[in-house]
Every structure is written in C-alpha cells, then in structure tokens.
C-alpha cells in the first residue's frame, strides 16, 4: 500500500553564528498609537531548539544543503524576474527587483517554526539585521515524491496567487478586499524583499508523512 505524504516547507535564513538576542523586546515592538505599544513573542526567545511535545516521535528536520538552498533561490528568482521583465500579464515592469540571497539566521528561525509541527505563523521572527521579517507557510500531502519536486510545486503555488492580484496590491502591500489569498505572492515579488531562508520538517503521524514548509522574507 502506498502511504500518503504530507509536506510543509519553511523558508528563513541565518548566518551561523547567531548574532541576535531574540529576547530583546524591542525586536518585536508594535506601535498601536502615539504612546501605546504591544510587545509580541519572538519565536527564538528561550526556545530549546527541540521539537514540540505534540510532534510525532519521528519528526525531523531535513538538512538544508547547498543544493537545496540554491534550488529555492533559483525558483524564486526566476519567478521574480518574470515580473521584473513585465512578462506577467497585468503587471508592469519592475523599476528594481533585487536578486534574492540566503540568510542563515532567518533559516534558523524558520526551523524553530516548523518544529511546532503545525501550520501556524509565529508572532515575530525579526532580527537585528532584518527588522520586518515576513513569513510564508505551505504544506502538501500526497504520494511519495522527490523533495525538489515538492519544493518547486509549493513555491509555484504561492506565485499562482497572482491570478487574484493586481499591481495595486503589490504597491500598497494590502489584502484582497474579498478575502482571496494573495499574500504569499505579494511577499514573493516585493521589490523590498531581498533575503530568504528555509527549513523542512518531515514526520509520519497518523499514517501520514508531514513536512512543514515555511518561508521567511525580509519585507
């Protein structure tokens, strides 16, 4: 019998030696009003680095090899270049579109997210270098398939959200008025986005394989 497969991928970056004090509350300070602030919880603050207790016993992080990093960057940059050159119908050429680069500190924070073993955004993953780190999440289920194929499909699924978006959504970085999902696409092709990182977790819980996939970009 062929086991079903479930995959989630997490994108984020870090240069390993960690340089940020993740418990510095100023990293996650959000202004509510002139004199009103909220301090969000940082995913890296006091994190043990271990999988959550709710994870299946066989849950494990797949190594983010150089080959895998390059694949993620290649797919993203090709899709971003398509927009930059004005080859995506309904979207003008981009005045600037930086080539995405990898950052290991963000990848580390992405890894902490997937170690929750659930499809859920964390409240904050900012660093000293990246004050506005966004996050894309995805997962997939199905029959066994090569990791590279899964990664490509998930990234392209984010990009496919362009069918519900217009250039104005990108310029103002706003939600769709009718609630359609476009946020992954707008994060991917923002000209302010120049850094990306990833993490992949896989497990077989309840007769399923599960790979959480999350993406963190500087926005």
Curated annotation (Swiss-Prot):
List, alphabetically, the SUPFAM superfamilies matched. PR-1-like
Q: GO cellular component terms?
A: extracellular region
Q: Where is the SCP domain?
A: 73-211
User: Is the Secreted keyword given for this protein?
Assistant: yes
- Disulfide bridge positions per record: 23-45, 28-124, 55-117
Q: Which Pfam families match?
A: CAP
- Mainly resides where? secreted
Q: Does the keyword section mention Signal? A: yes
Keyword annotations for this protein, in alphabetical order, are: Allergen, Disulfide bond, Secreted, Signal
**Secretion signal: which residues?**
1-19
InterPro entries (UniProt xref) = CAP_dom, CAP_sf, CRISP-related, P14a_insect
Where expressed (tissue)?
A: Expressed in salivary glands.
What does the UniProt entry say about where the protein is found? Secreted
Q: Which family does it belong to?
A: Belongs to the CRISP family.
Q: What is this protein called?
A: Antigen 5 like allergen Cul n 1
Q: Which organism is it from?
A: Culicoides nubeculosus (Biting midge)
